[in-house]
Amino acid sequence: MKLDELAAIRRDLHQIPELGFQEYKTQAYLLNHLAKHPEGRIEIEKWRTGLFVKVKGTAPEKILAYRADMDGLSIREDTGYSFSSVHQDRMHACGHDFHMTIALGIIDHFVRHPVKQDLLFLFQPAEEGPGGAEPMLESDLFKKWEPSMITALHIAPELPVGTIGTKSGLLFANTSELVIELEGKGGHAAYPHLAEDMVVAASSLVTQMQSIVARNVDPLDSAVITIGTITGGSAQNIIAQEARLEGTIRTLSPASMEQVKKRIEAMVRGLETAYQCSGKVSYPAAYYQVCNSSDLVEDFMQFVSENGLAEVVRSKEAMTGEDFGYMLKKYPGFMFWLGVDSPYGLHHAKLQPKEEALETAVRVMTAYFSSKAN
């Protein structure tokens, strides 16, 4: 598939971003494209709003898998593209339009150039939330088509086109959503001594939590606690009865994640005493770390470099989260960054990845799978 064909698909998908488990138009678009392939070369199974697509090998003994996430984000696009999102306040701001396009390009190649082994392509919904990888792994289809290895990529705005980046072991952090709900006794702004101010309580808690990383996490490890939103109160002259804090926790080890959560919960218990309120801590979604299989990823990097398929750089661990980690927890495999050279980063309303990177990714993955599946 040539670059202009890949770009056309990407632009179509870019216009129809949908949130997790709402990817109905996206699924329909993918099915329509896949229907163009000769009957008998591929098998397609729907799974919720996602797809399992198997490209049949000539004499299969195993299955090699590739995963592409599908969902968009709740962001109002500001790219100025002529092919901007037609869904208000929805955008493919994390490159999932790229990821799906690349998967379609790889499928197209192997339909026309069969290899010995079966290739399984997973179009996974809800990576951005509430998380599609775990329920997809638990589906009967994964039992039917169990892979011997699994791979994925993610666009990297900071890397130039023609470059990929990855590493052995830990690549992406453990991540967890965080919600804290506080409830006390509201009242009139003129009588603070008769009320329990949850805005003040929430502010105090945010300040306290800044000490957790500095004093409760191993200095040789890393962790980030970010409170992204605080809501509370209803009017300027009413002391807030309730407050809600939402954020994320990110750590480079499961042990640090457990420690951070314990400290947050202890601080909330202390807050209940100090401010005579009640507090509830919850973690609506959590993603396991992305940990690459060292032997497979080292072999992949060597293969790409020796064959001149792309420039290869060794990445550092990133605090980004990815539910692909659950797939790597169960199956050998790896993930890598794909350079797309955008002046704006992931989850930015002006993210503008260069489409030439589509060709790089398809070239790399078709060559790699050809070497491993024959």
Swiss-Prot record:
| EC number annotated for this UniProt entry | 3.5.1.47
Which Pfam families would you find in this protein's record? M20_dimer, Peptidase_M20
Task: Give start-end ranges for the coiled-coil region(s).
Answer: none
UniProt superkingdom: Bacteria
Q: Where is the active site?
A: D69, E128
Q: Does the keyword Magnesium apply?
A: no
The biological process GO terms on file are: diaminopimelate biosynthetic process; lysine biosynthetic process via diaminopimelate
Which GO molecular function entries does the Swiss-Prot or TrEMBL record give?
N-acetyldiaminopimelate deacetylase activity
Hey, which pathway is this one from?
Answer: Amino-acid biosynthesis; L-lysine biosynthesis via DAP pathway; LL-2,6-diaminopimelate from (S)-tetrahydrodipicolinate (acetylase route): step 3/3
Which protein family is it in? Answer: Belongs to the peptidase M20A family. N-acetyldiaminopimelate deacetylase subfamily.
Q: What is this protein called?
A: N-acetyldiaminopimelate deacetylase
Query: Species name for this entry?
Result: Bacillus licheniformis (strain ATCC 14580 / DSM 13 / JCM 2505 / CCUG 7422 / NBRC 12200 / NCIMB 9375 / NCTC 10341 / NRRL NRS-1264 / Gibson 46)
